Structures are given as C-alpha cells and as structure tokens.
C-alpha cells in the first residue's frame, strides 16, 4: 500500500541524504545523478524506467519545502536541487543514510 501523498518515507530520506552529501562535497544535485547515487549506494530504482519516480519524489520534496530548485536554472536546462533550512532541520531522520553515503565514498 503506498504512503499518502506528501509524506516522507525512506526513499525521500535517501534523496535528501544524497543532496545533502553532494552539497557537502561541493557537487551539484541533478535528477539523473541523484538517481545514479540511489542505484549505486542503496540499490533502489535499478531499472532505467524508474528515473521518473525520482522526479516525482523531487517534486514532492519541493512541495514540502525540504528542497528547492536552483534559482539560476531555467526550465529548459538541467534542473539542480538544494536542501532548504527545513530540509536541514530534519537531518536526524536521514543521518543513517548519510552514513551509508560516507562509507561508500
């Protein structure tokens, strides 16, 4: 049974951890490289068709105010994402995913 729309499950927490980790290392978070990181580190969304699910999660996280689109990007180029202060405020919920990313780095 799917979670109600607007809730934060494990996949959204993993995405927040990936974006947070990228920001800490000075990398930019795009939908594609977030998906690659989910595949490589968490063995999630292994099918190439699953990338669309990542974009649904990114849109939900934007709506919830945990991430934002980079202001310098426009709709006709790659969209990057950054953590907001609200997203940083729930870091304790995705810390264990950050540890996995650090261990695999």
PLM ranges: what are they?
Residues 30-45:
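DNA-recognition alpha helix
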Residues 62-72:
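A short, conserved structural fragment
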Residues 89-105:
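Amphipathic alpha-helical dimerization/coiled-coil segments
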Residues 72-93:
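Short, cationic-aromatic polyanion-contact patches
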Residues 54-64:
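Basic amphipathic alpha-helical segments that dock to polyanions
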Residues 17, 36, 92:
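A cross-family signal for key residues in well-ordered alpha-helices
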Residues 1-29:
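Short alpha-helical segments that sit at the start of domains
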